[in-house]
Amino acid sequence: MTPTELNLKAKALLETHFEDIVLSGEISKITLHGSGHWYFDLKDERSSIACAMFKGANLKVGFKPAVGDFLELCGSVSLYPESGRYQFIATSMKKAGFGDLEAQFLALKERLQKEGLFDPLFKKSLPKFPKKVGIITSKTSAALQDMLKLIHQKEYFLAKIYIFDALTQGNNAPFSLIQALKKADDMDLDVLIIARGGGSREDLFCFNDENLAREIFKAKTPIISAIGHEIDYVISDFVADFRAPTPSAAIDTLFYSKLDIEQSLDLMEEKLMQLWNHKIQNYENLLLNLSKFFKFNSLPKIIDEKIKQSHNIEKQLNHLLANQMRYNELKLDKLQNAYLQHENFFNKSKKFICIRKNGKIANLEDLKSDDIVILSSQTSQKEAKIL
């Protein structure tokens, strides 16, 4: 018997014996295809099954299903001979209440909210110019690479970045995230970002863990929650000090670019000049009013005294302005020095060679004789064999 023959027999057996079945479960993944067909996974506590509902059938459904929906389906089981993969073909669909994941999320959210963990009174302010920034995420994630790339593009070299590796998906992820959070919170950081890129509701569910939420609330370090995409909400978003819709948005919120800093200093100088001119104008008007009021020859001494007071005030204002300008110049010099130091580092990094084996970054001490590796820099790459 060939695989095709076996699959055809299995298909006939399934379609004969599994007709008009009522199937209940929770959607864990779904794709609303451009063709109009719906493809999704339905799960219970222990298992899941691939399902499909074709356009002709789903036009009769009065809602768009989503991850977390608990559904009751009617249909039959079928099998594709080409792949040997079987799935449930739904002919009707109706909602049967909230799914387990959604129910757990809403129950925990309501309980923590009543306890006050989401209260704005407990939110810590984010630093304006952070110098020590921690990022908790998977060290191999695309989200981390996107964040580091954006920091480099902004030319913000004042901050030192600390990476805390943690699982961001699966049953062991909450414990891993908590351990990383405790370690980071003991390092006297200015701010901490908990980040993960997009994924299904199940993929992100580790950030709905109650113990993780309580550790975030207890942390002394200001925390930004940057999980998934803008439409994704998890418990850590509500308990953190600030919620960023994406990991990249967290970087945009936290870091100024070099141009932003220069514009801020220019604006500060402009405001100081406006304040100085305003004060001078006020005192000039005061002197003018006094000179009009005191018209008698017996009062020239008083007028002279007021003029001297005005001159003294003008000197004080000039002195204050000069001090502020010197302070701004020193601050700008520090920013420029920091930029030049880090710019030199990044220029040197262009000469670094990266070793990859089987598509992954490899440590030199892990390589063996006859291993085939790829040596790459920012400008080229070569294949090499370890002797």
Swiss-Prot record:
Its EC number is 3.1.11.6. The keyword Phosphoprotein does not apply. It catalyses: Exonucleolytic cleavage in either 5'- to 3'- or 3'- to 5'-direction to yield nucleoside 5'-phosphates. Heterooligomer composed of large and small subunits. CDD domains: ExoVII_LU_OBF. GO terms for cellular component: cytoplasm; exodeoxyribonuclease VII complex. This is Exodeoxyribonuclease 7 large subunit. It is found in: Cytoplasm. It comes from the Bacteria. Keywords: Cytoplasm, Exonuclease, Hydrolase, Nuclease. Bidirectionally degrades single-stranded DNA into large acid-insoluble oligonucleotides, which are then degraded further into small acid-soluble oligonucleotides.
